Amino acid sequence: MSKPKVGINGFGRIGRLVLRAAVEKDTVDVVAVNDPFINIDYMVYMFKYDSTHGRFKGSVSAEGGKLIVTNGKTTHHISVHNSKDPAEIPWGVDGAEYVVESTGVFTTTDKASAHLKGGAKKVIISAPSADAPMFVMGVNNDMYDKANNHIISNASCTTNCLAPLAKVIHDKFGIIEGLMTTVHATTATQKTVDGPSGKLWRDGRGAGQNIIPASTGAAKAVGKVIPGLNGKLTGMANRVPTPDVSVVDLTCRLQKGATMDEIKAAVKEAANGPMKGILEYTEDQVVSTDFTGDTHSSIFDSLACISLNPNFVKLIAWYDNEYGYSNRVVDLISYIASR
């Protein structure tokens, strides 16, 4: 079977790392990139050098109006466009059937469907969506309906971390209710120094100077991908001055009491079985930078978890909110292409 042909709209943090993941995994063929604000020479530079993930381990160049990206094993010849209107991007001409919508702007079904006018067959939004169906690999991807799901969402990086863990715990022990906190790395929407920020004044404070309490819909979104948890989870974020890697703290009440050893055994079994590659299990004394570049959605930290009693537990899981998530975008494309 030929590799799915992919277009990327928006060459920001996620757009560039989806391309890196695509080259590394060699399961999809990226044939086009669109970004109205970045010309091709600047794309070469931004893809080659990355302050968080280091230099690209391969070569990238601009030749004849195309990005040529290779890691020695596979070469991607990528058409470059600079259109502001998604409907005007000629995905069909480039052969891009699957479009990654990673601008952060076109996150509704209506807005993202503009890509279909240019010849795309499916659109994968790399963010939560108000109305597009959300799929989390390892959790509910089997609910994908090829005939009807043309605009889909890969949910958020935090939902991708929380949902696999919540599924394992809920399936085995039953979650009555839970609160999630993500200690989350800085992202591009934050300010380097204090500045204006609409109604959410705290969000406008300097990212490098503060721990900033913030909202997140990640926990509630788990209820959309695991219907049995709908209305049982909510959460918040604390934004911290680190460039990448975040950590989820899920504090929940269990229906069926369990020792921490029983919980660890259940997670380890899933990590080595049905969720291999999605969920990871560690018994090492790790810190955040140990997971920069980790491709898993969720890494369960067995040493950091605690319980008050068999029915009330705090569970900890790490995630590279950039690269782990970008790998799932590529995996989701591979999955829907195989249906």
Swiss-Prot record:
Pathway: Carbohydrate degradation; glycolysis; pyruvate from D-glyceraldehyde 3-phosphate: step 1/5. Its EC number is 1.2.1.12. Keywords: Cytoplasm, Glycolysis, NAD, Oxidoreductase. The record marks H184 as: Activates thiol group during catalysis. PROSITE patterns: GAPDH. NCBIfam families: GAPDH-I. It comes from Brugia malayi (Filarial nematode worm). It comes from the Eukaryota. The gene is G3PD. It catalyses: D-glyceraldehyde 3-phosphate + phosphate + NAD(+) = (2R)-3-phospho-glyceroyl phosphate + NADH + H(+). Homotetramer. D-glyceraldehyde 3-phosphate binds at S156, C157, T158, T187, T216, G217, R239. GO terms for cellular component: cytosol. This is Glyceraldehyde-3-phosphate dehydrogenase. It is an enzyme of class 1 (oxidoreductase). It is found in: Cytoplasm. GO terms for molecular function: glyceraldehyde-3-phosphate dehydrogenase (NAD+) (phosphorylating) activity; NAD binding; NADP binding. One of its GO terms (biological process) is glycolytic process. The active site is at C157. The keyword Transmembrane does not apply.
